[in-house]
Amino acid sequence: MKFMKLGSKPDSFQSDEDCVRYVATELATDVVVIVGDVKFHLHKFPLLSKSARLQKLIATTTTDEQSDDDEIRIPDIPGGPPAFEICAKFCYGMAVTLNAYNVVAVRCAAEYLEMYESIENGNLVYKMEVFLNSSVLRSWKDSIIVLQTTRSFYPWSEDVKLDVRCLESIALKAAMDPARVDWSYTYNRRKLLPPEMNNNSVPRDWWVEDLAELSIDLFKRVVSTIRRKGGVLPEVIGEALEVYAAKRIPGFMIQNDDNDDEEDVMEQRSLLETLVSMLPSEKQSVSCGFLIKLLKSSVSFECGEEERKELSRRIGEKLEEANVGDLLIRAPEGGETVYDIDIVETLIDEFVTQTEKRDELDCSDDINDSSKANVAKLIDGYLAEISRIETNLSTTKFITIAEKVSTFPRQSHDGVYRAIDMFLKQHPGITKSEKKSSSKLMDCRKLSPEACAHAVQNERLPLRVVVQILFFEQVRATTKPSLPPSGSHGSSRTTTEEECESVTATEETTTTTRDKTSSSEKTKAKGVVMSRIFSKLWTGKDKDGVGDVSSSDTSESPGSVTTVGDKSTPSTRRRRSSS
């Protein structure tokens, strides 16, 4: 820290009582200066020789009845008694030390006392300006300290432009080439630096942690000045906002709903809304994770609708960067669910809107498809997780969210299957119709062999879906290698679907009869049907690895599914009776 010493005489100020200060000298005092609740017994000559304001006040002063000294009251001097005492010592030529912590108070007090060059050469205002310009404002940390102290001395600090000069100094240094930074700064994130940067390198965001010490209004002014001057990348501005939020917002890293103090809530709400307004417009300036943390905090602190909409829009632009944990946003108290599912639905809608806009601008299809694939994977994982923890999640809401990404490209539907399976597992009380509707979200042709193996043994899935999976697995096994695994090109898709409908028609009769049987009979019936289905689908595979499935074009009756050469047998009739 820079400092400056003024004067050479020893300090002879002493205290008589708690609120009385005087100069220990043989010469009797002849003026009493009252500053707040402190009385200073001083001498007119050294004071009046340097202060134009005291000259004016002494002309209209009253006399102290006890000491016959003239009495001056200056209750509104910036900095109060401590600042006035430094100014008085300067008038006496006594040694005083100035630094970044007291320079604002003394500079404003000197301005108040009108200690200008017109009164005496080398007066206090001049010396303070020399110290500020040659030392304080050239120091990174001193400039920040001075800027912080200016708040307590408005409007005087503003009148002498101390705040503006500090802002300019800080912005100039922040925009400087990091290679030229040769002063100390606070940086506790070095472990996050890329491996190619050694410990001696200065990171481009070297300044952001020091600015996190500022109040939000000063921080906003500094960042605005930095952006106006240019030379700092939007990504670094975004990093500064994230570091500031992490330091200043309680529970920012982990969503916190414990907000009992209304005054604190209002303060944090204002801070959040200010940070949102400061977000750079560039898409890559802030991470999706940071935006989601802001959104979570805005829910906790009940920020305005405008801020939430802006955050949702920004998140929608880069939703593919999020992870499942990011989307677990706690709902306001009193809701049906623990987590806010509606807000996730809004984020998906925003993503869809943004991709449509990119399509209109003829953006690369590969980029859009890649983003959609990532979002589809994200939402599949989210649905699986939210199904696990939300017992009140409705089938309608589950399907609504899943359908929003149903047309997005996927390498497989394993994620969709896992989400459906978890939903059925955690919500056993849903109706058969709801099970059927939710299961339709999955394309059985796009399941991996591992997922198929799990699904065919999954008792939670409707039997019709299990039959479809078995059928398409058989088709996949018998299709020539040159054809797509899903068998979904041209007329082959129509034929496959018709054949599958014939196979799955078996389940219709089974389901009807199942409703009339006991629990044990249901299990037995399903086992018989499943055994029969396996037999029908894999007969061909046992014979030279090729199966032949024929079906009626119109009938969905159980008898419409036969293998070549298969005839009605007593066992067949027994299966139908059991089903």
Swiss-Prot record:
Q: Which residues form a coiled coil?
A: none
Q: Which residues carry this modification: Phosphotyrosine?
A: 417
Please give the residue ranges the record annotates as the region Disordered.
Answer: 479-526, 540-579
- Quote the pathway field: Protein modification; protein ubiquitination
Biased composition regions of type Low complexity, renumbered to the chain: 485-494, 502-512, 547-562
Q: What is this protein called?
A: Phototropic-responsive NPH3 family protein NPY3
Query: Which residue range or ranges hold the NPH3 domain?
Result: 205-476
Q: What is known of its domains?
A: The BTB/POZ domain mediates the interaction with some component of ubiquitin ligase complexes.
Name where it's found.
Cell membrane; Cytoplasm, Cytosol
What role does it play?
May act as a substrate-specific adapter of an E3 ubiquitin-protein ligase complex (CUL3-RBX1-BTB) which mediates the ubiquitination and subsequent proteasomal degradation of target proteins. Regulates basipetal PIN proteins (e.g. PIN1) polarization to establish inward auxin transport from the L1 surface of incipient organ primordia; this process is essential for the progression of flower organs development. Recruited to the plasma membrane by PINs (e.g. PIN1 and PIN2) and, in concert with AGC kinases-mediated (e.g.
The family database entries (InterPro entries) matched by this protein are listed as: BTB/POZ_dom (IPR000210), NPH3/RPT2-like (IPR043454), NPH3_dom (IPR027356), SKP1/BTB/POZ_sf (IPR011333)
Q: Which domain of life is it from?
A: Eukaryota
Q: Where along the chain is composition biased (Basic and acidic residues)? A: 513-524
What family does this chain come from, according to its entry? Belongs to the NPH3 family.
Q: Kindly state the tissue distribution recorded for this protein.
A: Accumulates in organ primordia such as cotyledons, leaves and floral organs. Induced by the transcription factor ARF5/MP at the periphery of inflorescence meristems. Expressed in the provascular and vascular systems. Highly expressed in primary root tips and radicles.
Question: In a knockout, what does one observe?
Answer: Lost basipetal PIN1 polarization, resulting in abnormal auxin accumulation all over the meristem surface as a result of the lack of an auxin sink. Plants missing NPY1/MAB4 and NPY3/MEL2 form pin-like inflorescences with several leaves and fertile flowers. Triple mutants missing NPY1/MAB4, NPY3/MEL2 and NPY5/MEL1 are sterile and have altered PIN1 localization in organs primordia (e.g.
Q: What organism does the UniProt record list as the source? A: Arabidopsis thaliana
Q: Which GO terms describe its cellular component?
A: cell periphery; cytosol; plasma membrane
Inducers of expression: Induced, in an ARF5/MP-dependent manner, in the shoot apical meristem (SAM) after auxin treatment of the shoot apex.
Every BTB domain range = 29-100
According to its UniProt entry, the protein's GO biological process terms are:
cellular response to auxin stimulus; flower development; positive gravitropism; positive regulation of flower development; protein localization involved in auxin polar transport; protein ubiquitination; regulation of auxin polar transport
| Keywords assigned by UniProt, alphabetized | Cell membrane, Cytoplasm, Membrane, Phosphoprotein, Ubl conjugation pathway
